[in-house]
């Protein structure tokens, strides 16, 4: 019975760092660690006093969004923004 109570108490124990690493803030794709791994670079400090380690390989995977080309001379009319499709209703039959 005592062992059962100890197991129940351990289930509700909240770990400070847990199994999952905390992510950095300020749009940095990295994790807060005490020491950075090989191939990672130090960006900024985390709130817990650890280093924000960002992986160069991960940042190369993310491609920045490019805005579509805007026509400077001509303006598109409202009619060209959408197409009216023919529909069949009860009243047209």
Swiss-Prot record:
Q: Which InterPro entries match?
A: Beta-defensin (IPR050544), Beta_defensin_dom (IPR025933)
Task: Keywords in alphabetical order, please.
Answer: Antibiotic, Antimicrobial, Defensin, Disulfide bond, Secreted, Signal
Signal peptide positions (record)? 1-18
Q: Which GO terms describe its biological process?
A: defense response to Gram-negative bacterium; defense response to Gram-positive bacterium; innate immune response; killing of cells of another organism
Query: What's an example GO cellular component term for this entry?
Result: extracellular region
Is ATP-binding given among the entry's keywords?
no
Q: Which Cys-Cys disulphide bridges does the record give?
A: 24-52, 32-46, 36-53
User: Where would you find this protein in the cell?
Assistant: Secreted
Superkingdom, natural source: Eukaryota
* Location (main, coarse): secreted
A Pfam match: Defensin_beta_2
Q: What job does the chain carry out?
A: Has antibacterial activity.
Family membership noted in the UniProt record: Belongs to the beta-defensin family.
Name the record gives this protein: Beta-defensin 128
Q: Which organism is it from?
A: Homo sapiens
């Amino acid at each position: 019975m005592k062992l059962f109570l100890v197991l129940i108490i351990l289930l509700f124990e909240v770990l400070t760092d847990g199994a999952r690493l905390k992510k950095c803030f300020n749009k940095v794709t990295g994790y807060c660690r005490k020491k950075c791994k090989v191939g990672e670079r130090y960006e900024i400090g985390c709130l817990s006093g650890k280093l924000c380690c960002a992986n160069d390989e991960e940042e190369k995977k993310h491609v920045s969004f490019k805005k579509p080309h805007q026509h400077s001379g001509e303006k598109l009319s409202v009619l060209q923004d959408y197409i009216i499709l023919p529909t069949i209703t009860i009243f047209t039959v």
